[in-house]
Amino acid sequence: MGIKTFNPYTPSRRHMTGSDFAEITTSTPEKSLVVSLKKNAGRNNQGKITVRHQGGGSRRKYRIIDFKRKKDGISAVVKTIEYDPNRTANIALICYADGEKAYILAPNGLQVGQTVMNGATAEIKVGNCLPLANIPVGSQIHNIELYPGKGGQLVRSAGNSAQLMAREGKYATLRLPSGEMRMVPISCRATLGQVGNIDHELVTLGKAGRVRHMGIRPTVRGSVMNPNDHPHGGGEGKTGIGRPGPVTPWGKPALGLKTRKKNKQSNKMIMRRRDGKALSK
């Protein structure tokens, strides 16, 4: 999928780029796999803001994606490649031999008419989903399970892929896109190939309005707020924050403070952090 540019008939249009959607084969989703999506604008069930800078955006419906890929031994034909407004990756509609339909993440290179399959006996080719125990070492994979049967949780965004580095005993070692080296049980499943829509990172939004269409509201600096709104606020002009270091709106240290729990159970599965350092046990 390529990137298209626009004629600069307005200043914001000058640097704007977008996807040409050349891989998309239909604009109408499968009705049986679409549900309504309610907007919460970052509020919880009490109406309190739990996530700032969310609200508005274009209306969208949620496409039910099969991240588990548990239908083993039955081949499926790729019917369409579709746009999904809820994620950066494109999705593929597949139809199994028994008539069941499902959406999966569309890997790079997957074409309409190709067949995909799930299970330990599946062929080693792009789009097939297998346990890590059956995938050759060195393969590029995505949609990786952290726990067997839970469904893919890792490496699902556009253009991403992880590499299967080694297998030892009950665990496989993966190199994630961030550079982190992590162990995952070999009974967990993963899909072969790289997630499609690889040019997504080259898109330049170009103007604030496109960000608002995505449901993202403006982020305001604390230093320009009033002191009752933020610890950095107040003062005449560009006054300093008056603290040893920056803090969050709730007074917690920001920028550089480690937030991961030191006694988290999954720490033992991380062999190397994304910054190249060993994780302190």
Curated annotation (Swiss-Prot):
Residues 272-281 have a biased composition (Basic and acidic residues). One of its GO terms (molecular function) is transferase activity. The keyword RNA-binding applies. One of its GO terms (biological process) is cytoplasmic translation. It holds the Pfam family Ribosomal_L2. Residues 220-281 are annotated as: Disordered. SMART domains: Ribosomal_L2, Ribosomal_L2_C. GO terms for cellular component: large ribosomal subunit. Belongs to the universal ribosomal protein uL2 family. One of the primary rRNA binding proteins. Required for association of the 30S and 50S subunits to form the 70S ribosome, for tRNA binding and peptide bond formation. It has been suggested to have peptidyltransferase activity; this is somewhat controversial. Makes several contacts with the 16S rRNA in the 70S ribosome. Part of the 50S ribosomal subunit. Forms a bridge to the 30S subunit in the 70S ribosome. HAMAP family: Ribosomal_uL2_B (MF_01320_B). This is Large ribosomal subunit protein uL2.
